[in-house]
Regions:
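A conserved segment at the C-terminal end of the G1
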Residues: 1-7, 16
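Short beta-alpha junctions and helix-cap segments that line functional grooves
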Residues: 9-10, 44-47, 212-215
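Short, glycine/charge-rich beta-strand/loop segments that flank catalytic centers
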Residues: 13-20
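Conserved C-terminal guanine-recognition region of P-loop GTPase G domains, centered on the G4
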Residues: 22-30, 40-134
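Conserved active-site aspartate in kinases
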Residues: 34
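C-terminal-of-GTPase-core extension/linker across diverse P-loop GTPases
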Residues: 86-229
Length: 229
């Protein structure tokens, strides 16, 4: 999924320190960090801090080796650090501070049709609120679906800048939070553009190409913006 080269093996506890890598999703790069297993007696404070600051958590379980136990142990470890799945917030008391994160359960070793049937059973037996993605690291099955699921759950959009009289550069989008406005996009292009912005024209989600839009117009994924200052 990334060009990182952590040590891998067909047994647990291979990863001993966080290893970053960049995962391409269409025309953007998303950083993934391979962490040590969470089912250990001691977790370094640096690792817990990393987990609290991340935008999203992927819990990898082995379908062929007690996946329920793996998930339960990982979730319990995260709970001890105050980290919970944002879709399961109503399962927890509101008398403490929680770090809420979107969490995907990535189920590895779905290598053939038999394992895919086991995956379906695994999902059916889980309590509500969990999103599970089947993959096979051996065959590559499900990797594209996982990438799309990560993009969707990050809740981000890609917006392209266009200079007057030129075509938009669609190779290097600006990545913004979903719900971002034209004004927020201008600030990402350059901090001075917010105060100096006179007009903005939009191609994409507008009623017609090149439509003038206001500063508070909410952008959509794939929009092209031409700013005039």
């Amino acid at each position: 999924m990334t060009i990182a080269t952590p040590e891998v093996a067909n047994f647990p506890f291979t990863t001993w320190q966080p290893t970053p890598g960049m995962m391409p999703i269409e025309n953007i790069q998303v950083q993934l960090i391979d962490t040590p297993a969470l089912d250990r007696d001691f977790l370094e404070p640096e690792l817990l801090d990393l987990l609290r600051r991340t935008d999203m958590i992927l819990i990898l379980v082995d379908l062929q080796s007690f996946p329920f136990d793996q998930l339960e142990t990982s979730v319990a470890t995260l709970e001890q650090a105050g980290i919970i799945h944002i879709d399961r917030l109503d399962h927890y008391p509101d008398d403490r501070r929680w770090y809420t994160k979107p969490i995907l359960v990535v189920v590895n070793k779905c290598d053939d049709e038999t394992q895919l049937e086991d995956f379906k059973v695994f999902c059916e037996l889980l309590e509500g609120g969990w999103s599970c993605i089947p993959i096979s690291a051996q065959t590559g099955f499900g990797i594209d679906g996982l990438k799309q699921a990560v993009f969707d759950r990050l809740n981000i959009i890609r917006v392209y800048s266009k200079a007057p009289g030129r075509e938009a550069d669609e190779t290097s989008p600006f990545v913004l939070d979903a719900g971002s406005t034209v004004e927020e996009f201008a600030g990402e292009v350059h901090q001075d553009f917010v105060a100096k912005l006179k007009t903005a024209r939009l191609w994409g989600s507008s009623d017609f190409d090149g439509q003038m839009v206001s500063r508070d117009y909410i952008l959509k994924d794939g929009d092209v913006i031409e700013l005039k200052i």
